[in-house]
């Protein structure tokens, strides 16, 4: 499944939603801070993202998936909520679906990392016992 050097191709639907999010942010002047803007830039401009960005995208959606879509003015086209603008900037519903797929890959990488640390510790302990 990969390691921390793996790159994750950004689906076209995610890119399109990220562009819409940027347009909304420009029109209304709110929604998303420095991290959201940086990720939005990557989603719009790059072909793929690295492990660190993939983790941030996954973290965003896990934190916001039950809150933002239910928030006030989420579907208001004239005055959208900050939550909607951020949601779109992070890739919208397409980004949410993509993040669920990314999560599986990220989980494998994190489990491999933990297993490697355990094995390293066991080897160190084994070396002390000799």
Please give the residue ranges for each predicted region.
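Arg/Lys-rich, low-complexity, intrinsically disordered basic segments
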Residues: 1-130
């Amino acid at each position: 499944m990969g390691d921390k050097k793996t790159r994750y191709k950004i689906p076209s639907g995610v890119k399109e939603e990220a562009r819409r999010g940027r347009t909304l942010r420009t029109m209304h002047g709110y929604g998303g801070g420095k991290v959201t803007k940086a990720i939005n830039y990557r989603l719009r401009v790059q072909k793929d993202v690295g492990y660190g960005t993939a983790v941030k995208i996954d973290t965003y959606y896990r934190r916001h998936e039950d809150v933002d879509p239910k928030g006030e003015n989420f579907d208001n086209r004239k005055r959208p909520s900050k939550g909607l603008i951020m949601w779109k900037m992070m890739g919208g519903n397409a980004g949410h679906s993509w993040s669920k797929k990314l999560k599986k890959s990220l989980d494998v990488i994190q489990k491999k990392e933990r297993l490697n640390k355990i094995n390293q510790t066991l080897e160190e302990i084994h070396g002390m016992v000799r």
